[in-house]
Each structure stands twice: as structure tokens, then as C-alpha cells.
Amino acid sequence: MKLLFFLPLIPFLVFSQISDRPNVVLFMADDMGMGDTSAYQFYTKNSDDQQIHTPAMEKLASMGMLFTDAHTPSSRCTPTRYGLLTGRYPWRARMKHWVLFGVQGDPLIEEDRPTLATLFRSQGYATAMVGKWHLGLRYTQTNGKPAAGWEDADLTKDV
């Protein structure tokens, strides 16, 4: 009899667990520091004329977690993205200096290399990337079909 009482509650328990998982939004912009947007004004104490007014970022920041002590492995975009997404020093990849250019070429992140995205997906998150990639792009194979890992991407549409 007690079991019959608890069975109808199971969906509510499952859904309450799902909603407890936080949403994660990671912003990364080239040449942007913590003091450049108003989202960190509470921390930097910069005056309004010293930063870009970003009300949407401010709202997201007020609802989430902010990092105030982050460091980059490089002053360049490609190695910084590689380090952030893989957790590895960028010089451990095949590219030892500078950045990757163009939209074709083999990806700098190996197909079997764990990334933030694979970690989040393993925990049931849906992942997406918008904007500059700069880590090597091999969207299509020579037969015109999407390359492994890009099957659900439609790269012909405007963002």
C-alpha cells in the first residue's frame, strides 16, 4: 500500500532533480578583460565611461557564478581556446605557435580528445557553440557529407 502512494510521486522527484542542474553559459571574447564590461563593475569599481554597458550580461551575471581569477595559457586566440576547451596546455597539440587561419584544415582538437562539451554531454547537457571557432574546421568530407561530429550542424544558415 505504501508503494502505491509513492509511485505517483516518482515523476515529480525525477523532474525536480533535472531542474536542479544549472544552465551554463560561457562567454569568451578576444581581447576582452574583466574590466571591459559592466557585468564585473561591482568587482572592478570602474566608472561607467571605462567600460561597455552590457545589461544582458549583467543580468546573467547576477543570476550565476562569476570568475575573477582566470588565466590564459597564451595571448593568442587559438591556443587559448584549445586550453579552455581541453584543459591541456596548447603546446601539447600539433600547433606550436601562432594561430590557425582559414575555415578548412584538420581540427586542432583530436576527435577522441575530451573537451568541456563532451564532459557536459556526458552529464546530460545539450551543448552548442556560437561565434569564432579558430581551432581548425573540417565540416565536410571529400564526398560532401558532414564530418564526424558535425552531423547535426547546419553551417549554411546565418547565426
Positions of PLM-derived features:
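Bacterial Sec-dependent N-terminal signal peptides
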Residues: M1-D20
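Formylglycine-dependent sulfatase
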Residues: F15-V159
